[in-house]
Amino acid sequence: MHDARIFNSSSNKTMNQNDEAGKSKIKPLRTNQRRVIGASKSSSHMGSHVGTTLIIGKNSHSTSHGVRNNSPENTIVIGRRNFSDGQIEYTKPASHSNKFKKDSILRDPNIDSNVEASKKLSEQIQLTVWFHEPRTSTEDVIIDASVIPGLKEGDICELVPLNTFKPHKKPKRLIFIIKNQSLLSKSSSLHTSNNNNNAGATTSTLSANNNNTTKTKTNFQISLISNPLQNLMDLPPRSLVQLKTILDVESIEADTIEIFIKDINLSRDLMWTFSSSLVGTCVYSEKRLTFLSNRTGVVKKIYKNGNELFSALICEKTKVVFRSKSAKLVFLVQLSREMWHFEETGEIMFHKLVNTLFPKIFKKWRDKNTHHAITIVLFTSVDLTNIPWTSLGQGERPNNRRDYFRVVVDQVSIFHWDRIMANLRLEFANFKRDIMLNCQPENNGKFTMAGQSLPSVKGNVLEAINVGIHLVNDRFKNTDLKHSLNHFILVTPGTGLFDVDYSLMHETSKKMLSIDCALDIVCLSQPPLHIVPLFRYRDPSKDGQISHCVPHWCDISFYKDSTANSTQWIPHCKIYELQMMGVMENEINDVKIERYRVPNEAKSMVEAMDKYDSDVFKPVNKDSDSKVTRELSSSPEQSTINSKTGTPKENSKPLSLIWNNRTSLLPNSSTARIDVSTTNSSVLGTVANSGKDVSALSSLYTLNKTSADKSVVHAPSIRADSRKGVKENVSRDRKEFNEITRTKLRPRLQKTEEFYKSDDSVSNTSKSRDILDSKSRNKQSSTKVEEEFETLTNLLWTEIRNPSKESHSDMLSFLRLSRWNDIFPSNIKRRLVKWRSFESPAALPVTTSIFPSTKQLETDYSFQIYSVFLNSENDLEIESTHDLMREMIQLRLLLGFQICYSDQVKKFESSRKPGGNAESLIKYFPKGSCYGSRIYMSLDDEIHRISCDYNGNLYVQMYRKIEELKHSRLLGSKDYRQQSYVPLIRTRYVDEYAPAKFDFINTKPLKYNWNQFDQLIAGYDDAIPPEKRQFHKMKFVVLPANIPKNAYFISNENLTDEEIRVEGLRKLIGLIERGKFVKSDDKESKRKEEILPEISFYTGNLYEFLSDQAETYDATGNEPSNSLMLGENMRFTKSIKLSQLAQELQSPTGVRLVDRTWHFKRHLHCFLGNELVSWFIECFEDIDNRNDATSYGQSLMDRGMIKHVESRHGFLDGYYFYTFEGEYIDKNYKPERLNSGWFNRKKNSSEKGSAVTSPTYTRNNSDTESAKSPVFPVQDNLDLRKITSNSIGQHMYDSETSSMAGSSTKTKQKKKFILSRSVKFNADPLKKSFRPEIVTVHYDRVHNPEHCYHIRLQWLNTTKKFIDDAILNWSRLCERHGLKLVETPWLELCTIPQVNPFHSFVDLKLVINPWTDPEFSDPNILKDNKFYYHLYLMKKSDFLLDNRSTVFFSKDHIEISYSWGKPIFQYAQYIHKTGAYIVELRDNGDLFLAPNNIHITRLNTSLSSVPEQDYLKSYKMDSQKVMLKFRSACTNEKILRGIFKEAKENWREKCSEVVLPAIN
């Protein structure tokens, strides 16, 4: 290997130009260095001390033309060469290792393996590295096949830089797989070019050039992608690297990789598919990954055997963890009484939260460029009883208590961190006052103090978790396309010990296992000396005995300020007397600490301290052994009494309690018989307690009392242990003591620090525990853990018998039982604070190793089986059983299921008879045939086995756990199932706390009928009724915005703002219609595609428009004789005479001619430009597209046949009014006489309203009926809900009902209209996905430009990334036409508090009531419309109508519905033009406001993705300003009176229709 270690030599040695003729040269990096690579000989001149070079190449075959020769004669030639001598060659015997063959690595079977080359490539070879740009090639590594022969597709190579400049730094290894695209040969000639930057460094890029000469084709050996590998590996251009092939593939396989995603909603089903696509590939840290041709994530961490790697291979066993940098975080901050206490460092707990913890988290978020949306809620529980909480026993909580929740911020972007912190500090300052003061109306409205806040150990932690779970209870409601997951963070000042109710603990645990959200508990106090998190409860199955458990669904962290002195000792236990010593010393409370006297015989202070330590920690003598033996032999009753008192018997010094607590952890001490040594969170902190039932504060009271006083202290009334439990404890401890005495171990010194080591690290166990754990005990314990893991009895939590003395194996058992176990890399030490979980929360893994035993599945589970057959005609366009099985698996993953993949699953599958085959189990979906495959999936207490037999039949076998009988309720405990849990919640802008409108505890997660789901996916639409298909839904409104400078324009035309916006809506609908999903065998002709459905625009009254439409249809909904349907024989050409064409256009089969009203201007005998264009395409043989039709229409205008009604435009394809010139008007046409005045016209029932219809030309397809008119088919019997209350709509729409007054006395048959159209939209037109991505789009067919235009989306399992891309395209089109696409909630505003209790709301009452104010209570105005002033205020404040109330649709002769369902809105709803706020108008005239959080979050997230965030700060959506401005207008009498005066003046000038377009 001496020849392989080549270093740079002097630059004066150059090669002879004549000898190297025809060879290409690499331009030197510096002028004083020169390296020459010969293409013909494939040699590398790297220099040596003796003037030799390393020759890598072929002997007998020239490779100057890049020809790959795989003949056995080809060998790699490595030798020493002097420029004046010939080439020296030598070869080595060939040997090929079969170990390199790996099933997960795909290879081309047509490429023969080069035996000798593989042998030689297993050794390190030095090459010169070049770099290429991503625009040239996306491959990470490109290798010249002629330079390194023998490489073939599928080989795994390792590249290591020769970093001679930084010998102290370990070089990074790059693992990569040889692909067909990464090997360059003659067919893919590349040209190299050098680009010099400012620093003088050379960056080599590759560009394809088929016309280059031979000498420029192979002037490089290996090239890496410049970004990011050049910076990551710290490689300068033209540096040396070592290359070799990897034979032992298992040595480079990663155990766990972490992929970070941002600004994308990657659902769990796509995580599974994404992970499957990564199997068999190599990744490196900071590698950008693409999925479905979209940038999806970045690899951040790679682990193997507890070590972090730079690069590795992903195999099927690799755990792929996804972390989100754009998640929805909910902070639940427990403001228990400890939050106002001082810590040992002198800092108040809450100041520690707001001054150190939150700022540090925000700083990490900003440094990592995360885009989270956070919600912060303060909560606490107030004890309303007069009983001191210290008298409560373990596991007990006061029955009479009241819970408070205060919302600080709700779904706010972390970009506003400064405002968030200001609100947090303000709310903390007022929180205690607000919850303690209660107004007494019967006592003249005076405020009184009621109750006291409970400590964290007795707080409402589980209740707060249930309230948070309600936010994510329904997975179909998560339609945020920018945030991937939800995460809960509970901040508490306690130590991680909580007293809970058993039934509530059980229900909460089941809910947490049924959702895919994680919970992190952050404790602000010091870590205790017991296992955490620890939940303590009274177990009904054990007659109320105290039990401790560690749940499997949460993690815990202990925050410690890094600025504190690391050398400062902080006690883990808080003792009140020591804390207050020197501050409140008096005769009543006196703590005496004797001064330590140095012995006279001591030579030095160090020797004195050593002697003291020796005396304290001296070995246990025989007397103490006998004493323990006598105590263990005592009666059970005496043991129970000792356990309750827990006080020392001999030493009565004030500090004896501290010492006894330290020694109580010794297994052979007198307190070894006590089961639990816990830390209770007291009024002043956490206090150590050696007694099991004595409270912490009660023990503290005994510090300064005499022995006579100690006898007065009583234990709590409820006993924790029964006699049977005490006997078992005594028997077990006696056995442990006998094992210790029989071993006759040498006594050793017990150090204090051993008893205070944290149990958070499973590897650190005390030495005293080693004495207790003998070989037999270890063997039994390990066997017991394995048996417990084999037969899982409780997946919710692990019961802990002694939290302060837990064995290593028991800790491993509950760590293995978590659904989140796969996100933790093996052999990695976990930190005290899980910053990574706060910065980028992890998604629930798609796989789990948890699986019940065969015996449990046979006895504790019910069984059900059904088959699924594919319907060839299905909405999801599934074409094969292979695709159907994949969709069934992905839908389950989307709704929270995990794939069971472990040895236990294989064991169960092997035991199945008949047909059990563990080899057929799959973790990822096979790329080929799925016949014979089977997969197990689990969620909560449900397991599904999906299998496909070799005949192509799909079967689903479901195992459901049989519910056990409920335990009887303990006396004195609270039963949450029999009464609703109604806490008091105060949202962001509300002044007072109000009862919640939902029972958060008794509401369980949704359960789905999977048989119906699978049948629906298979194509059977009747499996689930349409009204029950509550899948993913999104609603968008199109609002008018400012016209941009680059707005849409037409040459030589001056369009108004309204005309530009109307044209934008038409183009938007055209874009949706052209994106319809059409099968390849169902393509329409180009002529038919040019005729698209049009929007029917109108102004004024909607019912006048619909009444006009109803007159053209009979009661059955059929078209009259003068239909627009054209016969097949009606075809014209452009040569038709103008007179004949005018006659045809005005005939019953021509274009629709009506009298139209637009903005109160009457246009007689006119038509629309877009309708005429569609008529031309349908009727003219020589017109096939809309452009030709528009040009022909312009020619008709130029020839004087038609004209614009106002002579402002030429002929345009759009919503423009045109009429005939006088000489071409039909002689039989007689204009109707117009009545003078708006009121008279309105009362004339025979007068047609402002009707504008859509084209009704035949399309010869399935959409014919829906394209004709908005009339709903008669066979669709839709009945609107009846509204019996006298609500707002009855008064608000009097002006509209009056338009029907003239016909109300006549009996008319009800006409049914559908005002929207549904389209199966293809969200993936470029076919990037492996399946059809279909979304159902509903858009309005009638629209008033002064209202909101609606677009609604519905889908089941479509990839959200494609939906987001489609929405972005629509939004860009809207912006160019002065429109804004805004996302709004699907449901109406008044229902949101039931979905999200933390959503901010504002209730407004007008400071002036126009109904009672003498100045505005004009009977003429209020009689016509009671809400006239309210609606004018809305219009004045830039609010547009969104939803009408249901009363508006309850007319006698017209029934209105939509393609997405029935309109059942209770109140009229309006949206601000910015999209930031939504307002509802109530019956009593009050206003109900709420921010449009989904739009605000989406907008701020998009702006945050731009690098220069500070520059864009002014562009951030600030909904609070909109609310404050509107609230000031409603609550300021002067401003509101001025608005109402203006409204009254306008009423006098105009009719009500002029002022009230916003109500139609």
From Swiss-Prot:
Pfam hit, one: IML1
Subcellular location: Vacuole membrane
A Gene Ontology term for the protein's cellular component: vacuolar membrane
Keywords (A to Z) from UniProt: Membrane, Vacuole
InterPro entries in the cross-refs: DEP_dom, IML1, IML1_N, WH-like_DNA-bd_sf, WH_DNA-bd_sf
Main localization, broad class: membrane
Ranges of residues in domain DEP: 1147-1222
Ranges annotated as biased composition (Basic and acidic residues): 617-630, 767-776
Molecular function GO terms recorded: GTPase activator activity
CDD domains reported for this sequence: DEP_DEPDC5-like
Lineage: superkingdom: Eukaryota
Any one of the GO BP annotations: negative regulation of TORC1 signaling
Biased composition (Polar residues): 7-19, 631-649, 1247-1264
UniProt topology in membrane: Peripheral membrane protein
Region (Disordered): 1-30, 188-212, 617-654, 756-784, 1237-1270
PANTHER family, A to Z: DEP DOMAIN CONTAINING PROTEIN 5, GATOR COMPLEX PROTEIN DEPDC5
Family stated for the protein in its record: Belongs to the IML1 family.
Protein name: Vacuolar membrane-associated protein IML1
Species of provenance: Debaryomyces hansenii (strain ATCC 36239 / CBS 767 / BCRC 21394 / JCM 1990 / NBRC 0083 / IGC 2968) (Yeast)
Organism phylogeny: Eukaryota, Fungi, Dikarya, Ascomycota, Saccharomycotina
Gene designation per UniProt: IML1
